[in-house]
Amino acid sequence: MQKEDLQCIQNHPGQRAAGTRLTLIMTRDDRSRTLETFIQTLEDHWPALIVERTRADDDGPPLLSLGDGLGFQGLPENTKLSPFLDILAGEVPRPPEEHRAILNRMALGEELRLYVAAHCPHCPKAFRQWAALALAGPNLRVRVVDGSLFPEEAAREGVQAVPTLVMNGDWRWSGNIPVNDVLRQLADRDPSQLSAAALEGLVKEGRASKLADAMQAHGSIFPAFIDLLTHAKW
C-alpha cells in the first residue's frame, strides 16, 4: 500500500465509527490474494472495521461487498480510496428526491457495472454518486469494477475510457453519466427481458422472493429463468 493511501486511512474521520462492516468474497482467481492483503492492512489501521470473509468455489472475480446492492471489484487505492472509505463510514450523500422517486418505481434491477481506474480524476464523483443510488434503492445493484486490476473485463465490454457505466452489456455511458436517463431506462424496462445472468445475480443475493413476485405480477415465467434452471451449473 502506498504511503499516501495509508495516511488517508489513518486520517479518515470515520475510522472509529462503530458498526463498520464489509464482506470479502474470495474465489480461485489469484487476485483474491491481492484484495486479501489490502483488507488485512485496512483492518490493522481501522479499529472498528468488521470484515466477513467468504469463499466462492468458482473462478469468478473476487469482490468487496459494501452493502445490499453495492460491490467493489478491485483495489480501492489512489483516487478510489477516499470514496471507498466514506462509504465504509456511512458518509454517503442522500440522492435527490427526483432520483429516489425513480428508484422506487423499479421492480427488478439488472446489475450496472461502473468501470473506474487509478488516477482517474472524474471517477470518485461517479463512484460516490452510483454508490449512494445503489444503497438507497433496494432494486438497484451496482458493481464498481477496477479496470486497472481487471483489464480483461473492461476489454470484453468495450470500455475505452473511465468512468464508464455499462448496462446489460449493451448500453454504456462515459464521462458525465446522465443519471436521470439511466434510472428512467431501468425503471421503465420490461423485467421479463432481464438476462439469465441478471436473474442469477438476484437469486445469489437472496432476492429470489422478489423475482417470484415480479413473475407473478407479470403473469408468466420469464424466458431467461427457464435458461437459468436448465443450465448445467445447476
Regions found by a protein language model. Name each.
Residues M1-G19, L75-L108, P191-A197:
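N-terminal leader/targeting and pre-domain segments
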Residues R31-T79, P93:
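N-terminal non-catalytic structural scaffold regions of very large proteins
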Residues A56-L70, P151-N168:
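Structural micro-motif
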